[in-house]
From Swiss-Prot:
Its cofactor is FMN. The gene is nqrC. SMART domains: FMN_bind. It comes from Haemophilus ducreyi (strain 35000HP / ATCC 700724). The modification FMN phosphoryl threonine is found at T224. Composed of six subunits; NqrA, NqrB, NqrC, NqrD, NqrE and NqrF. NQR complex catalyzes the reduction of ubiquinone-1 to ubiquinol by two successive reactions, coupled with the transport of Na(+) ions from the cytoplasm to the periplasm. NqrA to NqrE are probably involved in the second step, the conversion of ubisemiquinone to ubiquinol. This is Na(+)-translocating NADH-quinone reductase subunit C. It is a single-pass membrane protein.
């Protein structure tokens, strides 16, 4: 049997290949081991943002305890606005990619530029100490300049007044479009009305929009396209193809909960 010569070309290549395989196994193992922790952190961040949109997130808030006490997740059929109970393992992103669980959006209706959406959405009823519904937090996403922007919007029982918003996932330009994640800008949405007297989506984000005290929010300076993306997201998700049917029913029932 020939003696292994690590200094030969073939020996060097063998060592490199073995080291590469070992490193790959280490990285793969680490990814598998870390995934449960990453999933927990992702879920915790989601809960934190839901609480933040609802105005329940404070400096010393225990996220998991507060979420469990005051938030009730529900699955909604967007076409009817009804709650559904038989949707297992709901994942909005995964459902939106599956033809069996998604809806193709007509180009003329696709204001948020998302092309497909899940047939269902998870909404979050916010309860008080007595178990009464005080608001609902709705997921919202749409394209900005560089990225898909994911956020939450809290709406009061009148199904019209914004109680808060937050963006938790986006890749817009830092210091410009990335300011959609700035709490100071997000506060400018509080108290704004989503709809006009004709029940049309009237909330508008753009340059000088705050002149309309009831419906307007000034866009971000130097981030016109990102601001337009936020505006378009509201126009789509609160219209008839988004949460429009659900909000009509929420308004009719929230006061009775």
């Amino acid at each position: 049997m020939a003696k292994f010569n690590k200094d030969s070309v073939s020996g060097t290549l063998t060592v490199v290949v073995l080291l590469s395989l070992i490193c790959s196994l280490i990285v793969a193992s680490a990814a598998v081991l870390l995934k449960p922790t990453q999933d927990i952190q992702k879920q915790l961040d989601k809960q934190k943002n839901i609480l933040q949109a609802a105005g329940l997130m404070h400096e010393n808030t225990n996220v998991q305890e507060t979420y469990a006490k005051f938030i009730e997740p529900k699955i909604v059929d967007l076409a009817t606005g009804d709650y559904v109970e038989d949707v297992a393992n709901f994942d909005a992103k995964a459902f939106a990619k599956d033809p069996a669980t998604s809806v193709a959006i007509k180009p003329e209706d696709d204001k948020a530029n998302i092309r497909m959406r899940a047939k269902y959405a998870e909404v979050y009823l916010v309860k008080d100490e007595m178990g009464q519904t005080t608001q609902v937090v709705l997921p919202m996403y749409g394209n900005g300049l560089w990225s898909m922007m994911y956020g939450f919007v809290a709406v009061q029982p009148d199904a019209n007044t914004v109680n808060g918003i937050t963006y938790y996932e986006q890749g817009e330009t830092a210091g410009l479009g990335g300011e959609i994640a700035n709490p100071n800008w997000q506060k400018s949405f509080v108290g704004k009305k989503l709809f006009n007297a004709n029940n049309e989506v009237a909330l508008t984000i753009g340059k000088g929009a705050s002149a309309d005290k009831e419906h307007g929010v000034d866009g971000l300076s130097g981030a016109t396209l990102t601001s337009k993306g936020v505006d378009n997201s509201f126009k789509y998700w609160f219209g008839t193809n988004g949460f429009g049917p659900y909000l009509a029913k929420f308004k009719a029932t929230a006061g009775a909960n």
